[in-house]
Amino acid sequence: MVYNHRIMIGSNVRREALAGGHVKGSMVRAHLKFVRDRYGDAAVASTVAALPPEVTAEVDGVLASSWCTFESLIKLDRAIARVCGREEHALMRELGHYSAQINLSTVYRAFRRDDIHDFFRRGAALHRQFQDFGTTEYEQVSPTRGRIRVRDATCYSPAYCASETGYLEEVIAIHGGKDVTIMESSCQCANDEICTFELHWH
């Protein structure tokens, strides 16, 4: 599978806001499972041990249906990158791929659709079931193009955008798309008002 990811933003400023938001525990569980599957149980133990105590208490044993703070998720992901010796951006994309594979084959398999545009439209409508900040809207641009806009997100991070890119790439591939390209044409991390993901596949 070929993936292409380009950030097409007008500023090199990369900022983040971590406090106040929550994500579903299924995301945390998928990221820990990624470490276990790729690097083994010892790497999971080292990752959890590298976290601040309050983050460890939140992510260790989290349920798929429960909520985890956005800040704890980002701290977990950065601990994974350090422990596994990976560059953060590349690892976040890979975590996004893995999360899509795991969640769409298990707890969220009922959300899969024959039509990828239908999946993204439904996903935008269900946004608040997976994170409690921001709103998402989906626009079908052509049979093989789409656009996702994320508005009013009080929490954001370059790491999360990279993970979202990987997730979108894998979702499109799971639904049969080839030669997937994701372009982030605007981003709150670069002082833009919204995050915009341009999707293209064959």
List the predicted regions and their residue ranges.
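N-terminal low-complexity or simple alpha-helical regulatory segments
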Residues: 2-104
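Short terminal or interdomain "cap/linker" segment that borders an active site or interface and mediates
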Residues: 2, 8-32, 128-165, 172-202
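Long, highly charged amphipathic alpha-helices
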Residues: 30, 46, 75, 122, ...
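Amphipathic interaction/junction segments at domain boundaries or subunit interfaces
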Residues: 4, 62-163, 186
